[in-house]
Amino acid sequence: MPKPRRVFLTILILLVLPLAAQAMTVRGRVTLSDGSPLPGVTVSAGSVTAVTDPDGRYELVLPDGGSVRVTAALQGFQTRAATVDGGGDATQDFTLHVSYGQEITVGSRAIGAEAEKAVPVDIIPEEQIRSSPSTETAQIIQKIAPSFNFPRPTITDGTDTVRPATLRGLGPDQLLVMVNGKRRHASALVNANNSVGRGSSGVDLNAIPASAIQSIEILRDGASAQYGSDAIAGVINLVLKSDAEPLSVSAKAGMTTHGDGQVIDTSVSGGFRLGRGAIFATGEYRDRYETNRAEADPRDQIRAGDAGNNAVAQPNHHWGDSYARDVMLFSNLNLPLTEDGKQVFYAFGGYSNRHGSHGGFFRRALQAQNQPQIYPLGFLPLIEPRVVDTSLTAGARGELATWFYDFSAGYGKNDFDFYVTDSLNTSLGPTLQTNQTRFYAGTLGDKLFTVNLDLSKEYKVGLAGPLNVAGGVEYRREGYAIEAGEPNSYRDGGFPDQFGNRAPAGAQVFPGFRPSNEVDTSRNSKAVYLDLEGDVLAKLRVGLAGRLEDFSDFGNTSNGKITVRYSPLRQLIFRGAASTGFRAPSLNQSYFSAVSTNFLRDPATGQLAPFEVGTYPVSSDIARALGATALRPETSRNLSAGLVFQPLANFEVTADYFNIDIEDRIVFSGNFTGPQVLPLIQPFGVTGARFFTNAIDTETKGYDLVANYQLGAGGWGRLDFSAAYSNNETKIVSEVATPPQLAGLSEVLFDRIERRRVECGQPKDNLRLMQSWNRGGLTATTRESRYGEFCSFTLLPIDDQIYDAAWLADFELAYDWRNYTLSVGAENLFDRFPDRNRLGTPQANFGIFPYPSQSPYGMNGRFVYTRVAYTF
């Protein structure tokens, strides 16, 4: 049977199934322990959900009359669940208690709903995570939060496998990521090539399985005064599932309608009682196959005079998503130590193993990088990383002598092993007797150890409400290491290239790390913080936060924050914040070194050509010869102001303006390969160099709009609508800080490519719309995303290109029947692609690369899928 007919029949069956189901209704009320109503609670049974109204009431319309498990959950409170027997309509009430085993929402150390905060916090609940067409955590966030960007770079070395994520158009390392409120370690990878976030090391969000996540909190405000380094753009906190829940098995399969990009994702998860507590465990396996949108290479492939040297254009490149196979395990334990549940031991952590594979630039048979006796038609070298990520955090929280305490210790580690296949080391000669095609190119390692003690207590001091006092101390130790690859991955074998000239040394596509690159270093920091927050007047809440931190490598830093929340009416809240922040230079930026093949614009031809360029730490002799100095922390000033308007219990609008000034931003320099710098670097035996430096000041400003509306349609079910818009613009507001040794070379230190990467390389505005209809067990969800325009990373104005904004649509139809959930859907329903690269420009590479690799929505086209889940 043809594939389109099978898909059509599957959809038809899912549409007909609800007609045979006998619906039942579950109603009830959710209250606090004192009997007062609790609005905003998510009550769910399978994929059917409702949110309690101002009187705490809810109603669920279920597809059949069988037994069903109903769950009531609200951040900051203990989740409650009950089994409701079938046989007709039923009533189920819940009483929720403040949770001592659950993290407090980011942005404040006082419990409260996100709308009550003085800073904007987005909450992505479990039902939105579960219904997303994506399975990767970072893509799920991008589908919902317009301030979040997750492009799909290609031919960027390891960045193809661990892709950068940004918030508000800033860098990946200016976003703090936490799990259950605890700092997450960064990836060992440095984004060293032509991608968004070049020169940074962010957190690998996709190492955390989405099936383990209860909710995702996004703080859109600077928070260094509360959480320390990196929280300049904001904070993402992943809250793990923690309750006893039935075992669930899920499987998803899909592919693009262009015949590639197959995804197979399976997960098993469940929560199990353990004494008075519970442990939730998740296992997930995902195969994501590559996509390829490269077009034919029109150039000669074989040396002149050889047979068929340009008979037809050759489709021999790879341009698209890389292959990735992920195996992930995660668990979260909460174990009360006392009968009243006020002393809790907790532990959470996980393991992930990713095998990636992606191509570099194709080496034609006639290029000096090839030995035609080994690859007579040329070759596409592959980088095949192995990325292993482990983490474990354990601690205790509860009440002690009227204080709430939280003591924890955590360890996280990321190892990034580089393997190169289908390649060669040109300098090892033209035969496999002296050469080889597979290399181990070395390992990058990053690790983080933290110890925290947090204390908080409410005091009555004569204000309109209690004063929440929170304080704490933190010790953090970071480590970074580079391990050399096998000798043949980097050494110069002395053989000439096919033209008799000196051959480039090292494995093609990624020369291995050399013994001279090896490093094993660490630093530590100690911090103390204090938070005060309370109702100064009946309608005015003020918060103050301060943090002092001492780093072993660059000294002290202090930061503060003030927040104000004013509510003249129950339906209206004005809020604002002012803070200072910082980002400590990462050890990766201070100590990373490597020699790699970079395809840069050749001044003679105007096209991309290979250059062997070395990256050197700022402490090295060659970097100091170019004027490099020790890296300083980035510092920031953040202002925000906004409002929350809730005219109806089921309708809410928020609007927030922000301004972020950053001084001494750390950037990756341009490639010093020209004749002006050769006298400086030739004594060191190299022909190209680059390094990290504090070079620019920037200003980022913009605004965010969010609206949510829920509509009960009586017997027709429930309708949910949401809209979110983000606008941001980043400008460089200073001259490039150029050392005297490079006088007159500021356009090389921070060239036009890097300027465009910072100022227009990411969309300046994004819009997300979502509509969801639920009746009984049937749920239909549509999403529309508008991605704003972005620019090419180009050196010459003649090559500049602006890629137009684009609308993409997703659709999913899901049906709950007894213990099964069946879903079919399409991502990028109308098969939208970004604008094509203009022919004749470096980004088009002779027409081989049709689409920009920095596209925020990739270049895969329509993706269709089906998903089935079973709950025991």
Language model: regions and residue ranges:
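Short, acidic, small-residue-rich periplasmic hinge/interaction motif at the N-terminus
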Residues: 33, 73-75, 87-131, 138, ...
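N-terminal periplasmic "start-of-domain" segments of outer-membrane beta-barrel proteins
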Residues: 48, 103-135, 158-159, 188-198, ...
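Short acidic/polar hinge/loop motifs at secondary-structure boundaries
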Residues: 61, 182-220
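N-terminal periplasmic accessory domains that precede
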Residues: 91-94, 137-140, 144, 163-166, ...
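Extracytoplasmic beta-strand/coil segments of soluble accessory domains associated
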Residues: 141-188
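Transmembrane beta-barrel wall of Gram-negative outer-membrane proteins
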Residues: 248, 258-377, 381-401, 816
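Gram-negative outer-membrane beta-barrel transporters
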Residues: 471, 652, 656-794, 867-871
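C-terminal beta-signal and adjacent terminal beta-strands/loops
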Residues: 729, 784-793, 814-872
